């Protein structure tokens, strides 16, 4: 879901590593320890929560989180909570990073001091205000200046303890006066529409002929200001909660025209002062924020076409895609957008086959084949992550969940054994888990995605052709990816592959480490199994599996997934779990009588049906076949005064659902839309609001079967595994190429040097793989030209946007301290990425 701007789409995403907290304040009790967790928030909306780390003042989280950001935001915030079993969890402190400051910490481990949390630290939102001066002639013939203050609306106010019933006080304040008025309370909304006008007398009556129109005395206006305070009406004994304030000096009204603008709410001037840094501890984070500005598809045609023909270039090292891998500092930087682009256009197998064959030809020892972090290895890794994730889940998730839930001790290192544990019993537990994992993997070959099988076939053929005397190389070329880079890492760190929601506990993590090591060795088909382990206890344990049947099972599996023309007969028939989780749904009114209330339910989506049940594992209460989903669209907040709602439209009715946050709502809408995209009866129009009290709230039509009044969005690809935007990936490649332009130019110089000089070359030139200098130079020239053309388009867009930008508009409210930073970014830095 992109934020639409004139002429382009803006995509925001963030990748976060939450490391650890240190030196948290002690608990005021005899135990002194705390049970803490960390949340990730867009402004104050929670989008992710870590597991609870018990009894620690230095909790280690080690959790990763990635999301596409579906809306604008000002701060990326992190809150450390102390869990309380009997009361509401208490906040220890927070880290708030301004959006414009995220680039300062880009992809760097950084320690942040925790800050205190109070009403002033939580201020957010903006107010639409209009001020107008008017003259009133009294009965005695004198003139009074009166100020009309109109508060129209607010947006994005903070939600306090799960509710927001806001009202505003409007005060005309000066050295010798303070006159306050109050709006009505708006219930259950943090986007209140007030539209109330308040009048204040701002000058003493004076003769009409004394001064010109609106020429009131300077000492009056210079010392007066309008202050708007937002409050949350509360029934608690502690009184109403402060939400924020703004102050407008009346100097802005020296012109005859009215003043109308948006303002950001600010904390109070006399707000509570935070304690000195370090009092609350610190939090280690690594944040990567990306913002892509994507033009329409035709802008990218030259660069995209150049990239897509990479597989056909001879030699492949002279292709645009291979050149990108050469200039990037990390091969993975290039591999991620390249693989996604090639998958989108069906060119990933030819490209990987070409670069793999070239790498095999350069390899001298069959024992080191595909063992480095080359562009080939990184591209295959990325392909397996994208195309093989559902396969991985179907194969491993049930067994991984069983291991996590069993809590059986599998420690076989005599030094690590706990008191009372039996080495023989632990070894048997571990053997059973390894056998189970090995069995599900080697029996899963028929389910391996076709694109992976086609790549494995090309690896097998290239390796066998290069090392004809080594009969095992056709297996090791494939096992180095499917076992060493796919299954073994997923077993070792299941949370990174969404097999578990969080990091596992230390005992389970140790078990998975031992299982992963054994599976990796079994899959490698190493001739000397015992030498594969540094630890003697692992070598002893491996004797359980030193039988020919294990090697035969691995070879049969590798033969199956690397066979030419193999297709997956289960790809359509087999139910695949796509997404599941708790959400809140509104009763659909299937019964004639009964309340249409809201209930928390466990939702489950497969490629066959969308169901909900009371709890995970319970029988379904209701099922919607995928073919009956006619549209999936957002539901306007005003329908039920609830955020993050969407609707799943069926032939008879719509199912209204509330997700936990905006990120989760986007994820559900996207996956439901994708899986139902090919339905023949999909709607073209829908109702963006609910049908309540005998009419649609959006168009006021009275019939519940009335045709929709707004066009459906849709437009996503039908492939349930892959949601790839080709233009966005080309934009990312442009961004990378632009940032590495100096290395592209150096590579051009290296091509020229090699064309005319055969002697020793400069050290910086020797890092590039250049098999054909003339062909490589030709491609480089085209890449530089394509990047330059896009650079000009971005520069023109920045200039146009700069001219349109208005301080005080809804997009750039007054009081935004980042506005000058925004102006500087628009005039100095590239617009394609932050």
From Swiss-Prot:
Modified residues (Phosphotyrosine): 66
Gene Ontology terms describing biological process: intracellular signal transduction; negative regulation of Ras protein signal transduction
An MF annotation (GO) of this entry: GTPase activator activity
Zinc finger motifs (Btk-type), residue ranges: 679-715
Stretches for region Disordered: 806-834
PROSITE patterns: C2, PH_DOMAIN, RAS_GTPASE_ACTIV_1, RAS_GTPASE_ACTIV_2, ZF_BTK
Phosphoserine modified-residue sites: 77, 809, 833
Role: Inhibitory regulator of the Ras-cyclic AMP pathway. May bind inositol tetrakisphosphate (IP4).
Name of the protein described by the UniProt record: Ras GTPase-activating protein 3
Organism listed in the record: Bos taurus (Bovine)
